[in-house]
């Protein structure tokens, strides 16, 4: 196996910053139990260019540069899967709205449930989503939600 040079490793680190969400395309390991299409959160890229994720289903088997492949989430379906996953781990109180990034004071149950994903959003975004659902305003693509944009562009892992 040939290891990538420092310039290549730097490029991989820029492509997959810590916190970004990825989808496994292929893993050339006959012993892995991680199915293609599984999503995870990038933790690091090591000095050999291996992308180290935390897979949503558990585990942290790395994606070896030149052997395996993955991509950052880039479709609405992939964004919805990520938002649904984030919703399972959303803080119970005083979190941030995943759609606009504003603080949501108080308990999670006091705010709106998104009409597009299984996650809680702030009251204002809940109202906007109701208008979107009624066809009265243009729908904001899930790839444009604050929590997706921030994580995909090097802002670190979304923690709500």
For each feature predicted by the language model, list its residue ranges.
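Basic/aromatic-rich interaction segments and small domains that mediate binding to polyanionic partners
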Residues: 2-13, 17-76
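Exposed loop/turn and edge beta-strand positions of beta-sandwich/beta-sheet ligand-binding modules
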Residues: 36, 91, 116
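Short, non-ligating residues that shape and space the ligands of small metal-coordination modules
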Residues: 105-107, 131-132
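Short linker/helix segments within small regulatory modules
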Residues: 108-119
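Short Cys/His-centered divalent metal-binding micro-motifs
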Residues: 123-133
């Amino acid at each position: 196996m040939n290891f990538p040079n420092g310039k290549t490793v730097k490029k991989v680190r820029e492509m997959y910053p810590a916190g970004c969400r990825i989808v496994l395309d292929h893993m050339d390991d006959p012993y892995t139990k991680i199915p293609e299409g599984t999503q995870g959160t990038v933790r690091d890229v090591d000095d050999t260019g291996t992308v180290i994720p935390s897979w949503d289903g558990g585990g942290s088997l790395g994606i070896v540069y030149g052997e395996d492949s993955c991509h950052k989430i880039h479709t609405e379906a992939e964004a919805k899967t990520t938002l649904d996953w984030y919703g399972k781990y959303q803080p119970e109180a005083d979190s941030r709205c995943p759609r606009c990034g504003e603080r949501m004071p108080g308990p999670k149950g006091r705010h709106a449930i998104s009409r597009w994903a299984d996650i809680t959003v702030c009251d204002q975004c809940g109202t906007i989503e109701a208008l979107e659902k009624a066809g009265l305003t243009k729908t904001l693509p899930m790839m444009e939600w604050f929590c997706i944009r921030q994580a995909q562009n090097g802002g670190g892992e979304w923690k709500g």
